[in-house]
Regions:
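Conserved beta-loop-beta/alpha segment of the NTase-like Rossmann-fold superfamily
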Residues: 1-66
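A short, conserved beta-strand element in the Rossmann-like catalytic core
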Residues: 5-6, 30-33, 129, 161, ...
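Active-site neighborhood of HAD-like aspartate-dependent phosphohydrolases
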Residues: 152-194
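Asp-based, Mg2+/Mn2+-dependent phosphohydrolase catalytic module
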Residues: 212-215, 219-233, 243-279, 283-316
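Substrate-recognition element of Asp-dependent hydrolases with the DxDx(T/V) motif
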Residues: 181, 185-221, 231-244, 290
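Residue-level signal for inorganic ion chemistry
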Residues: 15, 29, 68, 92, ...
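Catalytic-core segments of class I nucleotidyltransferases/pyrophosphorylases
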Residues: 23-24, 31, 37-44, 56-60, ...
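Active-site metal-binding loops of divalent metal-dependent hydrolases
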Residues: 26-30, 201, 282-283
Length: 316
């Protein structure tokens, strides 16, 4: 907590004490639905970082950093340039050389210095952008943000749908994507679907593998999919089973399919277009779970991409 106002720049000074290295900074009054990996990759060697930019067309009354252009990833000013600051930044720790413990503006003082020295990069994005920094936009926020994030969802079982089910899959060696999965997940993302994994993982409760092993495997899956610009929005798992060895997991739970508590929790936390949402599974318990939550259901077929494409066509 600041003892005195330090501005958008001076407030960052407190991070210096925490020995921060690379970091992402987001303005609190903007929504910019971008791929952060693309922003990170846009930074060139021997620069401080990179700024996410948006075309300044419907934001004429916006007073944020503007009149910007990009040349070979390096950011500069130009009188008639159409790009403006989108409020998301990737910085190296070297940024702290330019941040003092005083009231100072990031956009009006620090960033202009970096731009003039040609040591800051920029990356243009065309994704959804909304700034509540003006009274007019603030009044529009609820309706526009709800509309943007109101999307259908694909609820997917994991073993037997995402990967081949070899029984209690919990390491990289045994994990293998089923045919069409990567292409199908990319297709779902392109068509603005949330992607949720809902999986029974009794192996955790039975001590066949650890929770840490489960998490490590999903980090591995995440790394593979990120290279394809695919992002799983949520992974829900149920470690419960009546025959579990670990006491806290030895019980019946509505999170375990055919119970539908995993799905119901997701429904409460996300703005979902349920009429176009669906579930793919490989067990009758998946089908029962989907029915309880009012979701269209199909058993996994031979090719995930073909199946996902067919379901989306059906929903149009």
């Amino acid at each position: 907590k600041e003892k005195k106002l330090l501005g958008t720049g001076g407030a960052l000074h407190s991070l210096k004490k925490k020995k921060v290295k690379d970091f992402i900074l987001l303005n609190g009054d903007t929504i910019f639905d971008i791929n952060l990996n693309d922003l990170i990759k846009s930074k060139k060697k021997n620069t401080i970082g990179s700024i996410a930019l948006i075309k300044n067309n419907s934001n004429k009354d916006n007073k944020k950093l503007n009149n910007l252009k990009i040349s070979d990833n390096i950011l500069s000013y130009s009188k008639n340039a159409s790009l403006m600051n989108g409020g998301i930044y990737y910085f190296k720790k070297d940024i702290f050389k330019y941040i003092q413990n005083k009231n100072i503006s990031l956009e009006n003082e620090i960033l202009p210095e970096l731009i003039n020295k040609k040591i800051i990069c920029g990356k243009k994005f065309n994704e959804f952008f909304f700034d509540i920094g003006t009274p007019k936009n603030f009044l529009k926020a609820d309706k526009l943000l709800y509309k943007h994030f109101f999307k259908p969802a694909a609820f997917l079982d994991r073993d037997g749908v995402i990967n081949f089910d070899k029984g209690y899959v919990h390491n990289k060696k045994d994990f293998k994507f089923r045919p069409g999965v990567v292409k199908g997940l990319k297709f779902l993302s392109k068509n603005k679907y949330y992607i949720f994994i809902v999986t029974n993982q009794a192996g955790i409760g039975k001590k066949i593998f650890s929770l840490n092993s489960f998490i490590k495997l999903h980090l591995h899956i995440k790394q593979i999919l990120q290279k394809e610009n695919i992002f799983i929005d949520n992974v829900s798992y149920s470690p419960f089973h009546p025959d579990a060895i670990i006491k806290k997991y030895k019980k019946n739970s509505s999170t375990r399919k055919p119970g539908n508590l995993m799905i119901e929790k997701i429904k409460k936390e996300w703005h979902l277009n349920l009429s176009k949402s669906f579930m793919i599974g490989d067990q009758n318990s998946d089908k029962i779970c989907a029915k309880k939550s009012g979701l269209y259901f199909e058993f996994a077929n031979k090719n995930f991409f073909s199946q996902a494409k067919s379901i989306i066509k059906r929903n149009q």
